[in-house]
Amino acid sequence: MALDAETKKSIIDEYATHPGDTGSPEVQVAILTQRIRDLTEHLKEHKHDHHSRRGLLLLVGQRRRLLGYLADIDISRYRALIERLGLRR
């Protein structure tokens, strides 16, 4: 369930902290969040797709680690990001 190039580019443009930024925690978390949302929709229709379910759990864990890292280095950036993404309601 990879993102198409256009979607990925729009996410990078929206969450980049500076021009050419593709690796900041904000960009990585935003991309992972979109992949998680897409995979969640897929699993609503295909309930027995356990291979994709495992992939979803891996993505959630990776996003959680990145968010923890961001919270450790700059709590204000962390809070701004979870607000923009609609996480931790």
UniProtKB/Swiss-Prot annotation:
Gene3D superfamilies: 6.10.250.3130, S15/NS1, RNA-binding. GO terms for molecular function: rRNA binding; structural constituent of ribosome. InterPro entries: Ribosomal_uS15, Ribosomal_uS15_bac-type, uS15_NS1_RNA-bd_sf. SMART domains: Ribosomal_S15. Part of the 30S ribosomal subunit. Forms a bridge to the 50S subunit in the 70S ribosome, contacting the 23S rRNA. NCBIfam families: S15_bact. This is Small ribosomal subunit protein uS15. It comes from Leifsonia xyli subsp. xyli (strain CTCB07). The lineage of its organism: Bacteria, Bacillati, Actinomycetota, Actinomycetes, Micrococcales. The gene is rpsO.
